[in-house]
From Swiss-Prot:
Lipid-anchored residues (GPI-anchor amidated serine): S106
Signal peptide: 1-22
Protein known as: Ly6/PLAUR domain-containing protein 2
Organism: Mus musculus
Propeptide: 107-127
Keyword Disulfide bond included in the entry's annotation: no
Native organism taxonomy: Eukaryota, Metazoa, Chordata, Craniata, Vertebrata
Amino acid sequence: MQGTWMVLLALILGTFGELAMALQCYTCANPVSASNCVTTTHCHINETMCKTTLYSLEIVFPFLGDSTVTKSCASKCEPSDVDGIGQTRPVSCCNSDLCNVDGAPSLGSPGGLLLALALFLLLGVLL
């Protein structure tokens, strides 16, 4: 019986382990208002960056409007130069879960760690 539980646990960890370790980013393929880009996506394992491209910088100056952006998972991301005044489509990159909430790096979500902890606690109770 104990062997069956170990196999079951291995299958669960194998299935959800990649999702727990995969990066999560906000994604919107077409330019939308930044406040409306709220879809979250589990990125492919080779996509280790969240990328945000700002499309309508001129309409938010002097920071009264809502910017238009695209957001995605990316395997490569080259951020814009911070001194690049006048760039038409600035790009920002980050590498923690849901860090591209505003197009700037932020603290990530500990969801994967919590899932792993819950599974190990469940294993301890079952055995």
